[in-house]
């Protein structure tokens, strides 16, 4: 089926969203145009406002509408811990755990094949933040448990070690409530390698 230029433009615009393919984008576009024009206009307005009004926190680099995000502006947070994550969505995930330290958001992970070296993801800015703050005694490396995430964590840990700073890595393994028979071998191997004594 061939669509008019404006409908095609809408479909192509929706396809930039993660997980949205051609068919899903077509259904979304037609739903907005046929059944929910007011919803489509609200969506367009919200997108425009977000694209114009949301930027990056000058300290941690997460998404915010202010110069400082709520976490960086909060003076009650622990200034001895810095949690390093790959993206803004990771900040929201870590916040759900009750973590009360500071953050630094990389722009992804190291990936030489994709041309993403230390400068591209912000490692020099991370090291400058640690040096300027001067209060961090622990840097928690909360990058994803992928090959690239592990390489990124290892690279940062090496830089921190050269400066005499402690780096820790988030644990990963068997999910709470999970059954061993359903866990993949790599995850189970990490869980066994990262085992710890039971405190009584």
From Swiss-Prot:
Gene3D superfamilies: 3.40.1360.10, 6.10.250.240, RecR Domain 1. A zinc finger (C4-type) spans 57-72. The keyword Electron transport does not apply. Keywords: DNA damage, DNA recombination, DNA repair, Metal-binding, Zinc, Zinc-finger. May play a role in DNA repair. It seems to be involved in an RecBC-independent recombinational process of DNA repair. It may act with RecF and RecO. The keyword rRNA-binding does not apply. The gene is recR. Signal peptide: none annotated. Residues 80-175 form the Toprim domain. InterPro entries: DNA_Rcmb_RecR, Rcmb_RecR, Rcmb_RecR_Znf, TOPRIM_dom, TOPRIM_RecR. One of its GO terms (molecular function) is zinc ion binding. GO terms for biological process: DNA recombination; DNA repair. This is Recombination protein RecR. It comes from Pseudomonas putida (strain GB-1). Belongs to the RecR family. It comes from the Bacteria.
């Amino acid at each position: 089926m061939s669509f008019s230029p404006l409908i095609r433009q809408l479909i192509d615009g929706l396809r930039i969203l993660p997980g949205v393919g051609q068919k899903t984008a077509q259904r979304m576009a037609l739903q907005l145009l046929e059944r929910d024009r007011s919803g489509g206009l609200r969506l367009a307005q919200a997108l425009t406002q977000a694209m114009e009004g949301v930027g990056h926190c000058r300290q941690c680099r997460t998404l915010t509408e202010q110069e400082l995000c709520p976490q960086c502006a909060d003076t009650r947070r622990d200034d001895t811990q810095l949690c390093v994550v790959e993206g803004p969505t990771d900040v929201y995930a870590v916040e759900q755990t009750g973590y009360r330290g500071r953050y630094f958001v990389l722009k992804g992970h190291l990936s030489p094949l994709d041309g993403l070296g230390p400068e591209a993801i912000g490692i020099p800015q991370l090291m400058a933040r640690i040096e300027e703050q001067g209060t961090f005694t622990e840097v928690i490396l909360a990058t994803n448990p992928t090959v690239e995430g592990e390489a990124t964590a290892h690279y940062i840990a090496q830089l921190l070690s050269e400066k005499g700073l402690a780096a820790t890595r988030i644990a990963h393994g068997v999910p709470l409530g999970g059954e061993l028979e359903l866990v993949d071998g790599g995850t189970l191997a990490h869980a066994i390698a990262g085992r710890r004594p039971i405190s009584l």
